[in-house]
Amino acid sequence: MSMSSTVIKFRAGVCEYNEDSRLCTPIPVQGEIEIKPNEEEELGFWDFEWRPTEKPVGRELDPISLILIPGETMWVPIKSSKSGRIFALVFSSNERYFFWLQEKNSGNLPLNELSAKDKEIYNKMIGVLNNSSESDEEESNDEKQKAQDVDVSMQD
């Protein structure tokens, strides 16, 4: 499958993250993430955009546009969230963005349990971010662990 035919789109909201309290607060707005190859496609870069799909009440929410560089960016499930499925987009600069998945879980899955569809999205994201050489395997596992240990408490 050539990269240029790959566009990943899924429903997700954005979270506010407070560095001091380490609280992650989902903003109650429907949104969408779209990831597609950047024009520097031969370098393996990807364009990432989150945008609200409805008008937020009482606040401005701008789209978030980022460039994903394989090997420099990770998509990490946040294990400490009990009331939702939260992922962090973590850059090697330690910049991070938090998103909550908005596809309804079918059946009786716990709120924080990834559905088959979520796992598919996760695997696609990992595929996008890993099409680089795996030379610094050690370091990246460390980083993953660090990101997962962020205390995320959902404010309902």
From Swiss-Prot:
Cellular component per GO, a single term: proteasome regulatory particle, lid subcomplex
GO biological process, one term: ubiquitin-dependent protein catabolic process
Pfam families: Rpn13_ADRM1_Pru
Subcellular location, record wording: Cytoplasm; Nucleus
Keyword ATP-binding: no
Domain Pru: 2-132
Molecular function via GO: ubiquitin binding
UniProt superkingdom: Eukaryota
Region spans: Disordered: 128-156
Residues with Phosphoserine modification: S133, S135, S140
Modified residues (N-acetylserine): S2
Assigned keywords, A-Z: Acetylation, Cytoplasm, Nucleus, Phosphoprotein, Proteasome
Disulphide connectivity of cysteines: none
Known partners and oligomeric status: Component of the 19S cap proteasome complex composed of at least RPN1, RPN2, RPN3, RPN4, RPN5, RPN6, RPN7, RPN8, RPN9, RPN10, RPN11, RPN12, RPN13, RPT1, RPT2, RPT3, RPT4, RPT5, and RPT6. The 19S subcomplex associates with the 20S proteasome subcomplex to form the functional 26S proteasome.
Family of the protein in this entry: Belongs to the RPN13 family.
Miscellaneous section: Present with 12200 molecules/cell in log phase SD medium.
Function: Component of the 19S cap proteasome complex which acts as a regulatory subunit of the 26S proteasome, involved in the ATP-dependent degradation of ubiquitinated proteins.
The protein's name in its UniProt record: 26S proteasome regulatory subunit RPN13
Organism of provenance: Saccharomyces cerevisiae (strain ATCC 204508 / S288c)
Lineage: Eukaryota, Fungi, Dikarya, Ascomycota, Saccharomycotina
